Amino acid sequence: MNKNIFCALVAAGVIVSAPVFANDDDVIDVQNTEVTVFGETRAFVEGGTATGKDPELKTSYSKLGVKYNNQFSPLTSVFGELSVDVDINGDGSDDITSRFGYVGVKSDLLGALSIGKTSSIMDSYVNKGAQFKASGNGSIQQTPFKLTNSVKYEKTTPIGVTFGAQSQMLDGATDETFDLWQIGATYQGVGVTYADDVINNISYYGIGASRSYGPISASGSFSVQDTTTTDIMGYEVVGGYTIKETTTILAGYGDTDATGDDGLITGGVHYKLGSDAVLFTEIDYDLDTEESVYSAGLGITF
């Protein structure tokens, strides 16, 4: 099935590649449907100071996909996405896996409703500490990034506030209609979300914020995982400074109140090569083990 999905994406890319890459907006009309091809290739070397940690070449976090939009009336359109994650690690196991696949209907008046495998609203509303390419972001307490068998609704008001609601509906033994649900809102870089994983008796809630002041950026999150036996609080903060619009220096810290977790310090430097490529070098320092993991590589997006 994964190979079939990949072949379909490759075929779509071949069909639209010439006009798409000739268009600055990367959009082409195919039988009155706007098709946008997007992706990212990220390759890096990862090593560390722990015993037995040898340098390793990785291509994780790469992706390829297409998005569709068809305006069938002046006020309403249908949209969708089909995408895969690609990890060309050479071991022949799970190199290509499904990322998202959904269809939906949207209008400026009523909002957007989609069904399928969608991205979690908690990740986009709260998880503001995900600023690094291959490091950090280990303290966030949230629902899974990818939600299969889900229904997702979002509506942006005239004043710019976006409200979101999402549920996961699985045919499981517990006979619950909504196996997981979450609601949230975001406005000008600040977001809040509450989620309830009914099947596993876990609730999540959190707040995240991201701000830029000229060359200075600041982002972070506070989140909680609440189970029947214990609560885990996590927080992350990341600061950045951009030099001449090409070089960004990042520093971050994340921690939870879980036993044995003293936190993680992360640093990195990102250097832009044009508008679509970034050279990066990053390092994680674990305050528990006093070991570090470093990475250096290149990411290209389109």
Please give the residue ranges for each predicted region.
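Outer-membrane beta-barrel proteins
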Residues: 2-302
